[in-house]
């Protein structure tokens, strides 16, 4: 059989490792904004706005309400124009079953009566990011408050 002394084995291993690293640099996966889907960009952009303040009627990082937040995020991250109100946003897109939610979907709630009054962006693991009265926050959809008020979800980008 073919046998190398320990010094030559170490040198050979170092050369093979260097060649593999070199090739992985040239031929490895490409991680650019272009490679991200619109829904991934939407989620990433929404996370940058966490802790922005709440402002009734707000549509900018200086202050958002729920639908102003989703409208702003989708416009900036996915070049998608959404209607201004939560109720009107609920009329857009394709309905999605709760068990089929994907990051970037819009989730809708009735928080003050009989019509849709709150919208947020689903980010995965039963969580969403939305502009609540305490500002832009991550929330758990499994909390009783949200479970009782859930209306449905829409997919507006892929």
Task: List PLM regions with ranges.
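Bacterial N-terminal signal peptides that target proteins for export
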Residues: 3-16
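Sec-exported extracytoplasmic/periplasmic mature domains
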Residues: 47-55, 74-79, 109-112, 155-158
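...with weaker cross-activation on analogous glycine-rich loops/strands in unrelated enzymes
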Residues: 2, 80-137
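Short, low-complexity, Pro/Ser/Thr/Gly-rich segments in the mature regions of secreted, periplasmic
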Residues: 145-158
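Catalytic cysteine-centered active-site loop
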Residues: 32, 53-103
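Bacterial N-terminal signal peptides
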Residues: 14-25
């Amino acid at each position: 059989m073919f046998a190398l002394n320990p010094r030559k084995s170490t040198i050979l291993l170092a050369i093979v490792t260097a060649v593999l690293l070199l090739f992985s640099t040239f031929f490895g996966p490409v991680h650019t904004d272009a490679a991200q889907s619109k829904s991934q960009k939407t989620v990433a952009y929404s996370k940058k706005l966490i802790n922005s303040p709440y402002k009734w009627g707000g549509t900018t990082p200086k202050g958002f309400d729920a639908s102003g937040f989703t409208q702003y995020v989708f416009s900036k991250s996915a070049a998608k124009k959404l209607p201004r109100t939560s109720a009107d946003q609920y009329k857009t897109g394709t309905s999605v079953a709760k068990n089929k939610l994907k990051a970037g979907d819009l989730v809708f709630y009735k928080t003050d009566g009989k019509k849709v009054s709150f919208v947020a962006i689903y980010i995965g693991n039963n969580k969403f990011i939305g502009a609540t009265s305490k500002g832009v926050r991550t929330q758990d959809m499994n909390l009783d408050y949200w479970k009782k008020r859930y209306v449905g979800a829409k997919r507006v980008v892929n």
